[in-house]
């Protein structure tokens, strides 16, 4: 039995979302239908609102509905320390720790020549312009510990060191609750190299 065209269209659009396959898209479509027109309207309104109201912060390039964003506008945040992250989810992860009191800069990706992502596709130019306007004392590079993240960290270091700014990299190592015997060699080596006195 074929589904009605509007349902098939909704399933097709939902399946375009990252991590959503056809079966999950189908379940979501039927959930939306079952929830009724009120829910569907609220969902459509929320999607339209995000597209209409969310933009990039002119300072840190995060997604926000206010410019500057809440972090950049907060006078209690230390503007001398900037944590550079690949994406907004990374910024949110750092914020959840409640340990970082500086500000952020979101690159919106990582260098990946094989995928056609070079420096001009990232928000690196905006970072350099920001540092011209308001010099920082330290840049914390918090890109992911993968090939693209490491390449991005190295590229940023080469750009930023000549500016006289201290460039640091987040530590990497064994996750809390992890077993040493299951750690890969690179992770274990970095954990040993990054050890600190107790």
Curated annotation (Swiss-Prot):
Gene Ontology MF term list: DNA binding; zinc ion binding
Alphabetical list of Pfam families matching this protein: RecR_C, RecR_HhH, RecR_ZnF, Toprim_4
Keywords attached to this entry: DNA damage, DNA recombination, DNA repair, Metal-binding, Zinc, Zinc-finger
Top-rank taxon: Bacteria
Zinc finger C4-type: from-to: 57-72
SMART domains xrefs: HhH1 (SM00278), TOPRIM (SM00493)
Coiled coil: none
Domain Toprim: 80-175
NCBIfam families: recR
Xref: HAMAP family: RecR (MF_00017)
Protein purpose: May play a role in DNA repair. It seems to be involved in an RecBC-independent recombinational process of DNA repair. It may act with RecF and RecO.
Protein name: Recombination protein RecR
Source organism (scientific name): Anaeromyxobacter sp. (strain Fw109-5)
């Amino acid at each position: 039995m074929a589904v009605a065209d509007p349902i098939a269209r909704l399933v097709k659009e939902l399946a375009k979302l990252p991590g959503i396959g056809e079966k999950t898209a189908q379940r979501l479509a039927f959930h939306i239908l079952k929830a009724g027109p009120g829910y569907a309207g609220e969902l459509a309104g929320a999607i339209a609102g995000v597209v209409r109201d969310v933009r990039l912060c002119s300072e840190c390039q995060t997604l926000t509905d206010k410019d500057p964003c809440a972090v950049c506008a907060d006078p209690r945040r230390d503007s001398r320390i900037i944590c550079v992250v690949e994406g907004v989810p990374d910024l949110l992860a750092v914020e959840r720790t409640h340990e970082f009191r500086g500000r952020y800069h979101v690159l919106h990706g990582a260098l990946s020549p094989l995928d056609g992502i070079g420096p001009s596709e990232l928000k690196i130019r905006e970072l350099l312009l920001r540092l011209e306007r308001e010099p920082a004392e330290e840049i914390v590079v918090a890109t992911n510990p993968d090939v693209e993240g490491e390449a991005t960290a190295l590229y940023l270091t080469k750009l930023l060191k000549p500016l006289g700014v201290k460039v640091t990299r987040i530590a990497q190592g064994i996750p809390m609750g992890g077993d040493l015997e299951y750690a890969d060699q690179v992770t274990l080596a970095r954990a040993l190299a990054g050890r600190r006195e107790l």
